[in-house]
Amino acid sequence: MSESSGTAFGGRRAIPPNTSNAAENDPPTVELQGLVPRGFNPQDYLNVTNVHLFKERWDSNKVDHHTDKYSNDKLIVRRGQSFYIQIDFNRPYDPTRDLFRVEYVIGLYPQENKGTYIPVPLVSELQSGKWGAKVVMREDRSVRLSVQSSADCIVGKFRMYVAVWTPYGVIRTSRNPETDTYILFNPWCEEDAVYLEN
């Protein structure tokens, strides 16, 4: 039997395998579902205006994660340990009617079951070793989150998005290289495979 010249992904695979986590494929900024009324304006709903990562060398994220000596202007954190981000919205956040979440993506074809697409749920209490985000401060139009990463997540440079749910679908922030987050191994975390006692 001769080889075909077309691209074959093998078996039941619907998408090609990831060959590099450095390659990027951005998720859509608007995912509408069902019928959308004629006058639908995404600006009528909760919108993200800015994201603060507290990524300066003197900020608590870099100091607490022992990454303040890295000469990189991105947020660098260690897996299995919580860090802070602040999201500014176009209006005050109301937890009874607004729903949003932070998403971390790595690689060209991100998938949740492969750990390359991570929708971080808002939780009332963070659990050790699991992804989660807890609201620690609400002030005017800003929300500060404590984000806990999994102790066994992929190590690398993640792209970060904020997704807001509306009655008609999801509105996601655009790709912003300033919100890229490096997640490293954590020898200070007991759940991490590289944990060192001393």
From Swiss-Prot:
The keyword Membrane does not apply. Factor XIII is activated by thrombin and calcium ion to a transglutaminase that catalyzes the formation of gamma-glutamyl-epsilon-lysine cross-links between fibrin chains, thus stabilizing the fibrin clot. Also cross-link alpha-2-plasmin inhibitor, or fibronectin, to the alpha chains of fibrin. Binds 1 Ca(2+) ion per subunit. Its EC number is 2.3.2.13. The record marks R38, G39 as: Cleavage. Its cofactor is Ca(2+). It catalyses: L-glutaminyl-[protein] + L-lysyl-[protein] = [protein]-L-lysyl-N(6)-5-L-glutamyl-[protein] + NH4(+). Residues 2-38 form a propeptide. It is found in: Cytoplasm; Secreted. This is Coagulation factor XIII A chain. GO terms for cellular component: cytoplasm; extracellular region. GO terms for molecular function: protein-glutamine gamma-glutamyltransferase activity. It comes from Bos taurus. Tetramer of two A chains (F13A1) and two B (F13B) chains.
